[in-house]
UniProtKB/Swiss-Prot annotation:
Main location: cytoplasm
Gene that encodes the chain: adh-5
Gene Ontology cellular component list: cytoplasm; cytosol
Organism for this UniProt entry: Caenorhabditis elegans
Name of the protein this chain belongs to: Alcohol dehydrogenase class-3
Residue pairs linked by disulfide bridges in the UniProt entry: none
Quaternary assembly: Homodimer.
Co-factor requirement: Zn(2+)
Length: 384
C-alpha cells in the first residue's frame, strides 16, 4: 500500500464555486476511499464541452461547489474495503458511465447504461450518499462520478477500468468521453454499414470521432457540416469526403438547409449525427436522413428545458431518431479494448490533442474551447 493509504490527502484541484464563474485553483482535502471505492492520483485530464455545459449553468443537475472533470487518467493510490479488481500502481481511466455487470441494464445487450449508482452520482455524491472532497471545511460535490480536475479523486470501483500500463496516460485519458462517444455512435449505436452515406453536424472532437468511425465502417460518402471553415481540414484528415458551411449555401426563399441537402445528396443520408447539442440542428439532421431508412443519432447535449420538434410525417415515412451515451460502449469491458486498438494503431488519439497545459491554466483551456480553437486540451498536474 502507498504511504498515504488511509490518510486524508491535501492536493491541488480546480474548484467550481458557482456557475458562470472561472474555476479556482485550491488546495482541497480528499478523504480515503470507503468500501468498493478507489482513490486515484490523476496525472492528466482533458476539458470537454460537458464540463463547460455545467460550468456555464446549462445543466439541470448542476451542483455547486463542485470538482468538475470526467476525461482523465491516472494511477491507483489506494483501494477501499472489498475492492478486488484494482491495486495501488494500476494505470486506470475513470468512467462516467459505470458498469456493475449486475443490474438489469448491464445484463441487457441493448444498452450500455448502468443504474446501480445513478441516483447518488446525479446528486454529486459517492454511492453511500457522501462526498470525499472538502475545501476549507466546506463540502464539495463530485461530478459524473469522476471529478478529474483534482490531483486525487475517489471513484466507485464500477466507475473505473484498468488499462495497458504501456499505453501513454496522456493520450488514453481522451477515451473517457469524447472520442469513445463519437466513434461508438457509429459502430455500436447505429452500426453503419460499408458503402453508407453519412453526414455529421459539428466538427469538434466528437464529430471528428464520428467521421473516424464512419471511415472505419467503410462509408462511401462522409459530409462534415460546421459554421467554422477552419475545421474542415481536420475533418478531411479524419475521413470526411467533403465539408459544408450552411451559411455559404444560397437557399431559395422558403427552402430549408435540410431540404437542400436532400436534393443535393440523392434523397438524403443513410445516417446523420448531431454533435452540437442544438435542437435546431437536431431537426436538420433528422430531416436530412433518407426517407424510408435513414437513421439520425443525437449525440450533443442540449440546454436544460429545450425540446426537439419535427413533423410526425418525418418518422412515419421511415426515418429513425435515436440517441447515444458514451457511444454505446459497455464501459469497463470496452475502454481497455479501445486502448489496445490505439496501441495497435487502429484508432487515432494523438491527432485530437491540440493544446497542452498545466492544471493552473485550466481557465485558458476553457476560453480556447469556447472560441472553437481546440479539439482537446490536455492538462497535466505535474509541470510540463
Amino acid at each position: 500500500m502507498s504511504s498515504t493509504a488511509g490518510q486524508v490527502i491535501n492536493c491541488k484541484a480546480a474548484v467550481a464555486w458557482s456557475a458562470k464563474a472561472p474555476l479556482s485553483i485550491e488546495t482541497i482535502q480528499v478523504a480515503p476511499p470507503k468500501a468498493h471505492e478507489v482513490r486515484v492520483k490523476i496525472l492528466y485530464t482533458a476539458v470537454c464541452h460537458t464540463d463547460a455545459y455545467t460550468l456555464d449553468g446549462h445543466d439541470p443537475e448542476g451542483l455547486f461547489p463542485v470538482v468538475l472533470g470526467h476525461e482523465g487518467s491516472g494511477i491507483v493510490e489506494s483501494v477501499g474495503e472489498g475492492v478486488t479488481g484494482f491495486a495501488p500502481g494500476d494505470h486506470v481511466v475513470p468512467l462516467y458511465v459505470p458498469q456493475c455487470k449486475e443490474c438489469e441494464y448491464c445484463k441487457n445487450p441493448k444498452t450500455n447504461l448502468c443504474q446501480k449508482i445513478r441516483i447518488s452520482q446525479g446528486n454529486g455524491f459517492m454511492p453511500d450518499g457522501s462526498s470525499r472532497f472538502t475545501c476549507n471545511g466546506k463540502q464539495l460535490f463530485h461530478f459524473m462520478g469522476c471529478s478529474t480536475f483534482s490531483e486525487y479523486t475517489v471513484v466507485a470501483d464500477i466507475s473505473l477500468c484498468k488499462v495497458n500500463p504501456e499505453a501513454p496516460l496522456e493520450k488514453v485519458s481522451l477515451l473517457g468521453c469524447g472520442i469513445s462517444t463519437g466513434y461508438g455512435a457509429v459502430l455500436n449505436t447505429c452500426k453503419v454499414e460499408e458503402g453508407s452515406t453519412v453526414a455529421v453536424w459539428g466538427l469538434g472532437a466528437v464529430g471528428l470521432a464520428v467521421i473516424m468511425g464512419a471511415k472505419a465502417a467503410g462509408a462511401k460518402k462522409i459530409v462534415g457540416i460546421d459554421l467554422i471553415e477552419s475545421k474542415f481540414e481536420s475533418a478531411k484528415f479524419f475521413g470526411a469526403t467533403e465539408c459544408i458551411n450552411p451559411k455559404s449555401v444560397e437557399l431559395p426563399e422558403g427552402k430549408s438547409f435540410q431540404a437542400w441537402l436532400v436534393e443535393q445528396f440523392d434523397g438524403g443520408f443513410d445516417y446523420t449525427f448531431e454533435c452540437i447539442g442544438n435542437v435546431h440542428t437536431m431537426r436538420q439532421a433528422l430531416e436530412a436522413a433518407h426517407k424510408g431508412w435513414g437513421v439520425s443519432c443525437i449525440i450533443g447535449v442540449a440546454g436544460a428545458g429545450q425540446e426537439i420538434a419535427t413533423r410526425p410525417f418525418q418518422l412515419v415515412t421511415g426515418r429513425t431518431w435515436k440517441g447515444t451515451a458514451f457511444g454505446g460502449w459497455k464501459s469497463v469491458e470496452s475502454v481497455p479494448r479501445l486502448v489496445d486498438d490505439y496501441m495497435n494503431k487502429k484508432l487515432l488519439i494523438d491527432e485530437f490533442i491540440t493544446h497542452r497545459w498545466n492544471i493552473d491554466d485550466i481557465n485558458t483551456a476553457f476560453d480556447v474551447l469556447h472560441k472553437g480553437e481546440s479539439l482537446r486540451s490536455v492538462l497535466a498536474f505535474e509541470k510540463i
